[in-house]
């Protein structure tokens, strides 16, 4: 309802489906969206542009998710398109329906690119006209002699049905390989799970191979990638006249919107699915982030959704739960459902892929229900607060000197935002910052929150003037352990801090170290929850996404990086002292000498704050975006 050729849309979800409509869509956290609501600029260095040259035509049984998984597998791990813009151009685009284009485009987020946009044609014109916005169409094509930084050749004819194994969309294998050798491939997945979760919880996938065939327990088609009309219609065509069986295989289908849900009902698609035994749910993307159809413990689910990150589907490893999710296209999921849960490729099933030519869009369902208040303010209307709606705690400005206590060390190759703050059941607490913060890293490191709270208690004592180099006066409302006080006082002594510095020019905050944090969702809560717990920084070798780094800055978390050649020896409970941190941020330094206290010894380390513009530095000095706008009177 917002996209148009040549436009740009900034959305608060990491997945955007606008590129196929000639719109540059970028997913960002709430802080960046707030800047736009206040009519400020979206500041971005000019990104590199990658040409995705699309040729060929999709084979029978191949859908948009197969293309997307193949693309993710080719470019994610090597960082080929990270923070770049993809331009889809070529004769192959004309053979794709709009739903197929959108289904590929929405998954470009999983390549780590910044955004993606497609050249437009008559199909885009007709799509916009169908939605009552014919005037928003204009042809978009590269100019003659257009120069690109990189090239990806995407031959649709070469794509076959694919599968993305746990725990990332880039773990791409052909479905043909997985069907032929399920034991070997799934054994590797079990080893990766063991390496990440240790002996606390185990994932058993190889025992699902019976007589050489892989049996799965659940199939789901849902969300912004899976729940498109063409995908669901193709699934219904595959299942037409058959059934999913009465065994332990479950199959659920979620449409993406009420207008599409209505069209599926009116065209009889939903009827055919229901008769096959599929469960047709309301339009909701819940299964994608663990808010619906959570698999059973140790189950294997095949899904046409966007992600299969660890625990994103809703499992809780801290309670002994773990499940595996394999991403597949809706067509092969339906083929598997037709085979009662035995993994099957849609390429091996006869069905009619004919795309519905007489599509309809009934906007009345929105007109009757959606309130449109933009440009019609009602300042006298009171806000209604419930008991679970709470104010944000006061967030301090950046101090002159900073003492960080390490409260989590995550040495996985990548740390996702789903691990930093789970979604699903926690979403009901997003209006209550303190309650939501209790779930921070709960499915990855259950000890983080208690450790962060202990660090925050030390800072509360210090700020109250009750924590000195050798003495402490406990306050009843500040729960602090004597051993924590002794540890921080020893840190003061080793660092040579004087009484005046501790009382007036120091802040004690927590810090998370991760090799590469922030892959996945745009949810700013991945950063804000750390800040609510009095976190002060992240330290990493690189940030997985621009949007997570922006979230850190907007919430006042210093986004420090390490040089690739520098090892990080810090452990939970260690301290990192950064002298003159406020002065260095203010004057634009990108190098920050620091001291790591590890094992009773001091070690000099260097932290970096690179590619940080003047506005970002102002936000960091103020403590967060809220403070920044409060100071400006906005």
Please report, for each region that a protein language model flagged, where it lies by residue.
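Fe-S-dependent hydro-lyases/dehydratases of central metabolism
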Residues: 1-634
